[in-house]
Amino acid sequence: MKMQRSAGILLPISSLPSPYGIGCFSQEAYDFVDWQILPIGPTGYGDSPYQSFSAFAGNPYFISLDALVEEGVLTAAECKKANFGRKADDINYSRLYTERGRLLRLAYSRSDIGHNEAFTAFCEKNKWWLDDFALFMAVKDRFEGKPWIEWAE
């Protein structure tokens, strides 16, 4: 059997160009036509895409801040003011966790997503994994991101 040879680019979404600390599903992503992506779950310890807190959830780092500006729940100035680290070509996961988390919480507080029928339907359809995941991540946040074996009783 003769196989056709081909070539491509392996590009982590996080490596796409972005002024907001990490590549995401914004216009820059659409500029790449044929590409394979690494796992896109929320990264765990060591920020590896292969060590995720969920097999089903998406990584919130990949939410396009430009789309949130277009929706009116963030401003371009808020995004520009955020400190994602000093080097534009290096992902600073510590700053990313702080700044993108802050911006995403701010966007959520300004949104009416709770009244969005598509969002409500998504939550209902996926509650078999989403409820436990949301609870786990909320408790993890309460314990400052520590591993669950270090949580207080």
Task: State each model region's role.
Residues K2-E153:
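Acidic/aromatic-lined carbohydrate-recognition and catalytic surfaces
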